[in-house]
């Protein structure tokens, strides 16, 4: 059974603000893939004072939609759930616009033997796992570093009521 107030994401429009519930809005980036399904969802929690979760990939249309969605609002925090190329790259732009604290697990360290580019022979891979030629490749955003590092399972609350 579907939650009655949550609209399905299958046919959600790209780069448009969708009201998911009274205090949550969503903007979907136009980056459909096997990793992001219909596209990466950026969530805005609150009404005037807001927290942005997963600013998203570096797509002009997504950045412009976020800019419009946040116009006249006070961004009090930016939360990055994980540092993949479809979730964190617009964080720097949003931080530059708002100065809001960036919360995330990170920064990612590069360990000896870490392979940034995949150079293995893909001829033996399962064809179902293949990335379409126009599909964005999933990578780790090694440049991202939060202001406040959180650990797995940690919870945090605003001392302010979202208004």
Label each residue range with its predicted role.
Residues 7-10, 26-29, 34-35, 144-152, ...:
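Short gly/ser/thr-rich secondary-structure transition/capping motifs
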Residues 57-162:
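Active-site HxH/HxHxD metal-binding segment of metal-dependent hydrolases
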Residues 51, 162-163:
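Short beta-strand segments
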Residues 1-16, 118-122:
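Accessory terminal helices/loops
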Residues 3, 11-13, 19-21, 81, ...:
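Intrinsic structural disorder
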Residues 10-11, 15-72:
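Conserved beta-strand hairpin/beta-sheet module of binuclear metal-dependent hydrolase folds
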């Amino acid at each position: 059974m579907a939650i009655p107030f949550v609209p399905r994401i299958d046919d959600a429009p790209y780069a448009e603000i969708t009201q998911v519930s009274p205090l949550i809005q969503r903007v979907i980036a136009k980056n459909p893939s096997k990793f992001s399904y219909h596209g990466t969802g950026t969530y805005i929690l609150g009404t005037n004072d807001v927290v942005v979760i997963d600013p998203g990939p570096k797509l002009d249309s997504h950045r412009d939609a976020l800019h419009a969605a946040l116009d006249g609002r006070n961004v009090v925090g930016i939360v990055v759930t994980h540092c993949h190329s479809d979730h964190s790259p617009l964080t720097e732009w949003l931080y530059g616009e708002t100065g809001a604290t960036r919360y995330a697990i990170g920064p990612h360290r590069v360990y000896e033997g870490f392979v940034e580019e995949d150079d293995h022979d893909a001829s033996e891979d399962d064809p179902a796992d293949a990335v379409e030629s126009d599909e964005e490749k999933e990578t780790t955003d090694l440049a991202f570093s939060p202001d406040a590092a959180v650990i797995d399972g940690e919870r945090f609350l605003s001392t302010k009521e979202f208004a």
